[in-house]
Amino acid sequence: MDNSFNDSRRVENCESRQYLLSDESPAISSVMFTAGVLGNLIALALLARRWRGDTGCSAGSRTSISLFHVLVTELVLTDLLGTCLISPVVLASYSRNQTLVALAPESRACTYFAFTMTFFSLATMLMLFAMALERYLAIGHPYFYRRRVSRRGGLAVLPAIYGVSLLFCSLPLLNYGEYVQYCPGTWCFIQHGRTAYLQLYATVLLLLIVAVLGCNISVILNLIRMQLRSKRSRCGLSGSSLRGPGSRRRGERTSMAEETDHLILLAIMTITFAVCSLPFTIFAYMDETSSRKEKWDLRALRFLSVNSIIDPWVFVILRPPVLRLMRSVLCCRTSLRAPEAPGASCSTQQTDLCGQL
């Protein structure tokens, strides 16, 4: 009885606390802010170089930037904007030794932080879903993709996602749900236990993660089918036909390699978001007393914030040479597991997945 009373008093103290405790340090928040801004700026610089290369291409040449990279650019911009709009509020709280509730009249800083946090977390997941859907259509339904999907249409994805996120995350401002302050007083989020909005928000994120994983699995299966069909067609060719349109076969291998690179990048970003969202999902479905006692609220926020920091670094680290290395490892394992057909004339060639001649 006394423990539950103390827990409720602690919750009320966190929601109304005006000053930070003396042992609170801004070190973690500062490192996260610096890493987030630096990673996103480097990723944007690399993407800008690709955009400049695309602009310099002649009218008849192949463009160097794809719809997938348009969506990656929009994801990086979203992560950078979220980092720059959220972290400075936390650093201001530490510098003034005041909680977010006390930082501005009528808890405006607390409401601002909670709204931007929910908005950019949802927008990031919607961007990943858009990227996964683009890959699914490009690989699984190429005819529809060529006729209906364009790079110009990809530019409309960002405002559409922002519009949906704005409507959904504005519900607490319309009295469906409420934003409150959590310990140690440097962050605010959806109130736990008063309405079903927190569970609804977590469920939407979970459904998006499942949808992205479903799209990725479908793309993997389609790539495997394409690889097997291409290998069978090469094996069935006679020696005279093998001396035919070599540039076409080279283009097919390059296309397969690019699709595999896109899939690797998207898969790692999706796994990262799924791992970062797991503590938040657990927190949303826990009862309020247990979540506070086990400090799941603070873990959920930190994991959710880390995602916008990791995403750009994934893109920065997974440059083409690294992706080629990963593809070669995959090809090596595939070739070791697959038995060689005796007398096959194409056994000395690399598979399309490798993207190499």
Swiss-Prot record:
Its main location: membrane. InterPro entries: GPCR_Rhodpsn (IPR000276), GPCR_Rhodpsn_7TM (IPR017452), Prostanoid_rcpt (IPR008365), Prostglndn_EP2_rcpt (IPR001923). One of its GO terms (biological process) is skeletal system development. Residues 1-24, 93-112, 178-199, 287-299 are extracellular. Residues 235-255 are annotated as: Disordered. Belongs to the G-protein coupled receptor 1 family. It is a multi-pass membrane protein. The lineage of its organism: Eukaryota, Metazoa, Chordata, Craniata, Vertebrata. Residues 49-66, 134-152, 225-262, 324-357 are cytoplasmic. It comes from the Eukaryota. GO terms for cellular component: plasma membrane. Receptor for prostaglandin E2 (PGE2). The activity of this receptor is mediated by G(s) proteins that stimulate adenylate cyclase. The subsequent raise in intracellular cAMP is responsible for the relaxing effect of this receptor on smooth muscle. This is Prostaglandin E2 receptor EP2 subtype.
